[in-house]
């Protein structure tokens, strides 16, 4: 019996052409550009509106109606005096106690009771009602930074509205996206400075305190070996007493007592600033990721 061979012929489809790397790059670039333009059209204005609402709240709390951008429509207001009792953080030390009355960023009155062995009764007590301007520079810086941010973002919002055109045709390009991104980064830096102004302590040197005019306004006068300082740290008003002592008593020749009080309105400001930074950073990330 004859065996017949069986031949199977298979027609394979032609090998697909390898994708052109340049075509892939062009497609990716085109997709990024479209996404960037979409973000400019849909996200930027919404984000700016939200950020400005939080900044407006800060301006109201800090009475910045005269400093912030008028387009926020912050009602004109006048600050009211607030008196704060400053105590040792441990709550048990009576080395230093103070009462400070603030009007916005100004110290109106300061009362101090500090342990001082050379004084009668072992304590030095004094009141200062300075007839010279006594500003807490950190609070003033906070207001200035926030005010500058409101102006920058209001200007940017106006520019974005102009780019939107009549609604049917807009003028958004990658160049406008780059400019928006640059302004947002500058704004973030300004907000960071605002936060740092009340989170990080900024103390005057002992030499500066010696020549600081309000220091000389205590009645009775401060002893020659005693200095008093007020500053902001972590949203707290801090009073520090510095007394020169023999190095046999303290190696540095300086005895320091501190008392403090939380400033609730600064806690509110920090919360708003943190929110603004979060939403602006999200927009910055989107724009940065879609820049070709």
Swiss-Prot record:
Alphabetized UniProt keyword annotations: Nucleus
Major subcellular site: nucleus
Polar residues bias locations: 1-12
Protein's cellular compartments: Nucleus envelope
Gene Ontology CC: nuclear envelope; RAVE complex
Segments for region (Disordered): 1-25
Organism domain of life: Eukaryota
Family: Belongs to the rogdi family.
PANTHER family the UniProt entry points to: LEUCINE ZIPPER CONTAINING TRANSCRIPTION FACTOR LZF1 (PTHR13618), PROTEIN ROGDI HOMOLOG (PTHR13618:SF1)
Protein's UniProt name: Protein rogdi homolog
């Amino acid at each position: 019996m004859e065996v017949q061979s069986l031949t199977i012929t298979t027609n394979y489809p032609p090998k697909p052409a390898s994708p052109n790397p340049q075509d892939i790059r062009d497609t990716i670039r085109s997709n990024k550009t479209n996404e960037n333009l979409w973000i400019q059209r849909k996200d930027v204005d919404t984000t700016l509106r939200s950020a400005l609402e939080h900044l407006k709240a800060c301006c109201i709390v800090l009475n910045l109606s005269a400093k912030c951008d008028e387009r926020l429509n912050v009602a004109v207001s006048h600050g009211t005096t607030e008196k704060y009792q400053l105590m040792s953080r441990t709550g048990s030390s009576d080395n230093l106690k103070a009462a400070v009355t603030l009007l916005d960023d100004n110290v109106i009155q300061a009362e101090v009771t500090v342990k001082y062995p050379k004084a009668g009764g072992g304590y030095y007590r004094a009141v200062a009602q300075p007839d010279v301007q006594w500003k807490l520079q950190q609070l003033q810086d906070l207001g200035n930074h926030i005010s500058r941010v409101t102006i920058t973002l209001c200007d940017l919002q106006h520019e974005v509205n102009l780019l939107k055109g009549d609604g049917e045709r807009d003028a958004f390009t990658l160049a406008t996206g780059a400019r928006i991104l640059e302004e947002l980064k500058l704004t973030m830096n300004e907000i960071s400075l605002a936060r740092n102004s009340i989170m990080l302590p900024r103390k005057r040197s002992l030499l500066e305190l010696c020549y600081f005019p309000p220091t000389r306004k205590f009645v009775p006068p401060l002893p020659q070996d005693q200095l008093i300082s007020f500053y902001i740290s972590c949203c707290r008003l801090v009073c520090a007493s510095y007394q020169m002592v023999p190095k046999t008593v303290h190696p540095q020749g300086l005895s320091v007592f501190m008392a403090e009080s939380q400033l609730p309105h600064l806690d509110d400001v920090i919360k708003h600033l943190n929110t603004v930074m979060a939403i602006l950073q999200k927009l910055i990330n989107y724009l940065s990721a879609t820049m070709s």
